[in-house]
Each structure stands twice: as C-alpha cells, then as structure tokens.
From Swiss-Prot:
Name of the protein in question: Glutamyl-tRNA(Gln) amidotransferase subunit A
Residue positions of the active site: K77 (charge relay system), S152 (charge relay system), S176 (acyl-ester intermediate)
Keyword Protein biosynthesis: yes
HAMAP family reported in the protein's UniProt record: GatA
Catalytic activity: L-glutamyl-tRNA(Gln) + L-glutamine + ATP + H2O = L-glutaminyl-tRNA(Gln) + L-glutamate + ADP + phosphate + H(+)
GO biological process, one term: translation
Keyword tags: ATP-binding, Ligase, Nucleotide-binding, Protein biosynthesis
Cross-referenced SUPFAM superfamilies: Amidase signature (AS) enzymes
E.C. code: 6.3.5.7
Entry's family note: Belongs to the amidase family. GatA subfamily.
C-alpha cells in the first residue's frame, strides 16, 4: 500500500468495496515498515501478531461503512500506555514495563476500529526537541537522514512522513507534535487542553501535556481527532463540552475570517526562508478572502523561561514515582534503601531528564519558590491574557511553527539552551492551553517549513477550516520525500 497516494477516506472506500482485505492492508503495512524503518528508525516495537489477528476479525465481521477509521493502522508514541504492549517512554527506567490497562485514547481508537501497528520513538519522557534523547535509538528525518526529525514526537512524525503509516498519535507539552510535524512536512495538531483525555499518558508536565494526531493531510487529522476527543471520568482535567465533528464545515473556506500575525514571532533567530514562507502564506489567505493584520503578543518573549520553570517543576514532582521500588528500573547490587533510590534514578534516567528534575526541584525549593515558580505562574497568566485580547477581534493567529528547518543530528544535543529555544514559537500555545496546528508551507534547501495556526480554546474547527483552505490552495502536502536520495 502506497500511503503517499492515499488518505483515510480512499483506503476506507477500498476496504468497504473489498478491493483488498484488512488483513492484506495490514500485512502490506508491516512489509513496508520493515523495509523503510531500517533507515528511519521511527518504531521502537511492532505489534504485528495482534494487529493481524485484529485485522482478520474485522474482515470476518465486515468493515463498517460509517466508520472511516475501521481497519486502518496507526502508530502510537511510546508514552501512551498500551495494555500488554511494552510502553517505555524511551527510557531505561521503563524498558520492560508492560501496562495492565489502556490509555483512554487507545480504547477510543479501538472502538473506532483502528489497528495499533506499534510504538514510536521519542525523547525520553517527552523531554527534548530532536528525539536524540531516546535511550534506545536516534530517529532520522526522511527528507535528509543526517537531520533530526524534531521532538519529542519525532518517531510519530517520521513514521507518517516516510509513508509507514497514515496516522500516528503524539503528545505536545511545549511543541512536541507541531515542531516534528514542521520538520517532516506533515500535519500535526495539539488540541485544546482538556479536549483529549490524558489518562494513560505518562506524565511530563500535567498542566501542559496533551495528546494529538499527526497525519499527511488536514482532513485525515480531523478524522483522528474526532475519534480520540471527549470527556473522560478518569481525567478530571478533561472537558465535558460536546465534541463537534471537526470535518463538518472544513471545506467552507476562509472568506471573511480575521487572522492575526504576531510581530514577535518573526524576531531574531527566525530563518529568512521560514519568515518568507509564512509571509507567502499570508498572501494566500488574503487571496482566499481572509483579512490579515499584524498584532502584538508582548509577553510571548517570556515563554521559554516560564515554560522551563513550570514544566520542569511539574516533571520533578511527576517523576518522583520512579524510585526503584514500586515499578521500573532498579539498580543491581544495592547496599541499602538510600542506594536503591539514588542509583536507580541515576542509572535509569538520561542526562536531559536529570537536568530537568534538578531544575524543577530547585524552582520548587523553599528559597526559590516565590522568585521562580510563583513568578513564572504569574507571567503565564499574562501570556494567556495576551491571547484572549487578540481573540476579541480575530478568529485565528498565524505564525511560523519553528524558527528553523531541521538541523543536523548531534548539532545541538550538547547545548541545552540552544535546544530549548527551538520551542520558542510553540510554547506559548501550551502555556495558554490553546489548540495549535502545524502544516506544510514550503521548503528550504530540500527541508520542510511549517506554518502554525493557533485558535481560541475549543475552536479546533476554525483551525481545521483554515488549514484545509490553505492546503487545498498549495501543493506542499503533496511533496514526496526520496528516501536516501536528493530532496
């Protein structure tokens, strides 16, 4: 199956019309993964036997005509727990962890008939922007295998971009869906905080984490978000709002839509080619009937320090549970209880995770709480207010997703501050709990450029409508990478 030339709807039609069976489709998917992933290394574990068993059962009962996702495979980021299937968060700490329950999003995907293909590589505990922090392997960018795929959902993006699956799930705490989507030339959506249940997502920063879909097209993305959204009694932060059909009205266009472009998102560090691509996108939206104005989000410049204080503080609390006693990695030949704690955590966690735990613990300490964590929380409120003020007059915000295109493997891994600045344009969206989308908007030296659309809370439908209009007016999403070739 050539996933570059198909979408969810076309494959569903083929399955309903019995051009091929679900089992044949699933076998073809695994055959392709085994060929392509030798170079990309997006998957940490495949679930072939159970996937084929489920495919056969769907063939026996017949593919549901009213469920577009029925019988189609999906890849899952390895911090989303999957019953009886190893879930590691790409950490030595959880190397052999087999959950006894499913994340809520997994139950929802199963209800929709989707087939879990396998678990995807990521930065350890979702801490990173390049997928180089994985304890197990480094995933490559299909457009240039010497480049990173972004992170932390690098495996999720690379698997879709390289045609191994049509859709995947990732998580986004500070840009971890949108930045890899931009680096790989695909569509990635971070939903509104509370739109999708976090139950079963291995926690990084609980006030920021959100699960979302990565796909090749905007409409496919909306279809997957339809399936995973909704209130969940297991997650007290999940919204009880009714979930609309995100595909409804997606083709209505942007005529009359008011779009804001923040001047702060084109500052120092934004590549010239990236800025030009986004400004070209502005012209496209204007030609489609939208009104586009420059505005200011003055407190966004504080986003990176605010984020790394809050996220690291929450991480230091969430990761206390990995102590060498309850579950997870336990150091060998320990001498006493203190040795169990110290050595298990020292040996089980990677450098970046330990760095953030230390930063968070410091920020929460008695002598630093007021100066750091409390102050960061106050500035976070100002960032939220900036967005609220803009949305009084505008329907959508348009900006670059990442300041640059994908950089080389090994180029920034030893410079944490430079690495952290990769998220400067995506972090404010998480701090404000807003929905954000990255979609393809051009190329620079053969590498994809991402356009970011940011909507008001629970206005994903507006974001999808604008994204679809742009996608249909351009050909960037149709570009197919040449694996191992010249792009």
């Amino acid at each position: 199956m050539d996933y570059f030339k198909n979408d969810l709807a076309s494959i569903h039609d083929d399955l309903v019309n019995k051009k091929y069976s679900v089992e044949e489709l699933t076998k073809s998917t695994f055959d392709n993964i085994k060929k392509v992933d030798k170079e990309i290394e997006a998957f940490l574990k495949l679930d072939e036997e159970r996937a084929l068993e489920k495919a056969r059962k769907i063939d026996e009962r017949g593919v549901k005509a009213d469920s577009i996702l029925d019988g189609i495979g999906i890849g899952i980021k390895d911090n989303i727990v999957t019953k009886d299937l190893t879930t590691t968060a790409a950490s030595k700490m959880l190397e052999n962890f087999e959950p006894i329950y499913n994340a809520t999003v997994m139950d929802k995907l199963n209800d929709a008939g989707m087939i879990t293909v396998g678990k995807l590589n990521m930065d350890e505990f979702a801490m990173g922007s390049s997928t180089e922090n994985s304890a197990f392997k480094i995933t490559k960018n299909v457009w240039d295998t010497t480049k990173v795929p972004g992170g932390s959902s690098g495996g999720s993006a690379a698997a879709v971009a390289s045609g191994q699956v049509l859709a995947s799930l990732g998580s986004d705490t500070g840009g971890s869906i949108r930045q890899p989507a931009a680096f790989n030339g695909i569509v990635g959506v971070k939903p509104t905080y509370g739109r999708v249940s976090r139950y079963g997502l291995i926690a990084f920063a609980s006030s920021l984490d959100q699960i979302g879909p990565l796909t090749r097209t905007v409409k496919d993305n909306a279809l997957v978000l339809n399936a995973i959204s909704g209130h969940d009694a297991h997650d007290f932060t999940s919204s009880s709002r009714e979930v609309p059909d995100f595909t409804k009205g997606i083709e209505d266009g942007v005529k009359g839509m008011r779009i804001a472009v923040p001047k702060e998102y084109f500052g120092e560090g934004v590549d010239e080619d990236v800025a030009k691509a986004v400004k070209d996108a502005v012209k496209t939206f204007e030609s489609l009937g939208a009104t586009v104005d420059e505005i200011s989000l003055p407190h966004s410049k504080y986003g990176v320090p605010v984020y790394y204080i809050i996220a690291s503080s929450e991480a230091s609390s969430n990761l206390q549970r990995y102590d060498g006693i309850r579950y997870g990695f336990r150091a060998k030949d320990v001498k006493n209880l203190e040795d169990v704690y110290v050595r298990s955590r020292s040996e089980g966690f990677g450098d970046e995770v330990k760095r953030r735990i230390m930063l968070g613990t410091f920020s929460l300490s008695a002598g630093s709480y007021d100066a750091f964590f409390k102050k960061a929380a106050q500035v976070r409120t100002l960032i939220c207010q900036d967005f609220e003020n803009v949305y009084k007059d505008y329907d959508l915000i348009l900006a670059p997703t990442s300041p640059t295109t994908a950089y080389g493997i090994g180029e920034e891994i030893n410079d944490p501050v430079t690495m952290y600045m990769n998220d400067i344009l995506t972090i404010p969206v998480n701090l404000a709990g807003l929905p954000g989308m990255s979609l393809p908007a051009g190329f620079s030296n053969g590498l994809p450029i991402g356009l970011q659309l940011i909507a008001p809370r629970f206005a994903e439908s507006t974001m999808y409508r604008a994204g679809y209009a742009f996608e249909q007016s351009t050909d960037f999403h149709k570009a197919i990478p040449t694996l191992g070739g010249q792009n």
